[in-house]
Amino acid sequence: MTTVLILMATHNGGSFLAEQLDSIAAQSHADWRLMVSDDASSDNTPAVLQAFRAARPTGQVALVSGPGRGAAANFRSLIRQARLSGECLAFCDQDDVWHPEHLARGLEALAGIANPLALYGSRVQVCDAGLNPVGLSPLPSRPLCFRNALVQNVISGNTQIMSPAAAALLQAA
């Protein structure tokens, strides 16, 4: 079974965080590790994270401190700190709720790609604060290809799962 390292950056996300953590724990693909970087939250985010880590097997959840420079710097810091050893890499946001098959579907799609540098992404079911569906994320307006990815967001970051080779390349960048 392929291990997936999930990276999550948090900051004052306590009001939504438990639902995302529960959705990670409920994944049908159970071979995952979670690394969370909290960027100086002043709400209950640290307590929610500590409780989740305490309820999981030892070593499955790692908590680190963010750099204190915003969401993008927090994710970059996570990528640099990740201890990769051949895992696929997935990203999530603190206010996501993953479908139980999210990791399994992504890994199945990656397994069907011959190129070792592979990236999976999906559309997002957009919900309101009560988790009531309000629509799907828009489809890209241009064909999916590298050239268009340079000028258009073709894969939402919070749906990305990348192959081990792609994860290593990202970390080395």
Residue ranges: model-predicted function:
Residues 1-173:
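Nucleotide-sugar donor-binding/catalytic module of glycosyltransferases
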